[in-house]
Amino acid sequence: LKQWELQQLFPVDRYPQLRFFLGDVRDQDRLRRALERVDTVVHAAALKQVPAAEYNPMEFVKTNVLGAENVIQACLDTGVRRVVALSTDKAAAPINLYGATKLCSDKLFIAANNIKGKRDLSFSVVRYGNVMGSRGSVIPFFLNQARKGVLPITDPAMTRFNISLQEGVAMVLWTLEHALGSELLVPKIPSYRIMDVAEAIGPGCEKPIVGIRPGEKIHEEMITASDSFSCIDLGPYYAILPSDGSGHERYDSASCSYSSVDKGFAYNSGSNPDFLSVPQLRELIKQYVDPNFAPF
């Protein structure tokens, strides 16, 4: 369906440079065919529902881990030059299987820079927070539930990072232009409290406490205190570099401007100094999710 919808938006007679493939990252031969004469790859394919991962662990391993390795091998084999893989805050100190598979994927893409040989090829990773309005996320769920007058709250203390789809795309484009390879980039973005999201969407709704789901955290991290020893500040983004020092050498050789973060620095959705207010959340929902939104 997604390929068909894209073909309607970008018909081949008007965009002859585009090709639309059905396939699966589990199928390395199909990946090689799809990547012929391709210079740039943005790897966004993943299974991502946390509870589903706990119940179907090997399916997540096949797509998120083995699929990532298939993408890497196909890029090495076909002459791709730039690869950006999308990650998640759940990959930082993961407590659920989904986060663990994405952490493994991150490590595979970063390590791929060590096996590229003399190819003009770099692999980088970008780590997002919750993409506002994405399928299966809390805001579309609350918008649907608000029509029933009830917003189930997992834990009133819960917080999450927030990024818009447009900001996420801009980060990928920045990475393609500026990244040197081997870095994991982290955006500087605000957090929200789950109770503020509930108040923004359904101030008149009931808000029963139902408990957290399997594999969930109260707060998410994008940079752990252990990461701080190899983390640098690039201005618009943080970058976690390989712990062997090769990333620092690469940035120093390229005369890039950066500063080191304090040892023990951690980037946590609960301790983030930048929180979205209820009015700000309502404006963002109108801007990025539903232009006709009004609180219930």
Model-inferred region functions:
Residues 21-22, 62, 155, 209:
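Conserved residues in the N-terminal Rossmann fold of short-chain dehydrogenase/reductase
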Residues 8, 14-40:
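Conserved Rossmann-fold cofactor-binding substructure of NAD(P)-dependent oxidoreductases
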Residues 43, 47-103, 107, 111:
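Conserved Rossmann-fold NAD(P)-dependent oxidoreductase catalytic core, especially the SDR/UDP-sugar
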Residues 1, 26, 48:
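Adenine-nucleotide cofactor-binding loop residues
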Residues 20, 60, 83, 123-126:
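Hydrophobic/aromatic anchor residues within beta-strands of the central parallel beta-sheet
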Residues 26, 91, 131-133:
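Conserved sequence/active-site signature of Rossmann-fold short-chain dehydrogenase/reductase
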Residues 71, 77, 107, 111-296:
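Strand-loop microenvironment adjacent to phosphate/nucleotide-handling motifs in alpha/beta enzyme folds
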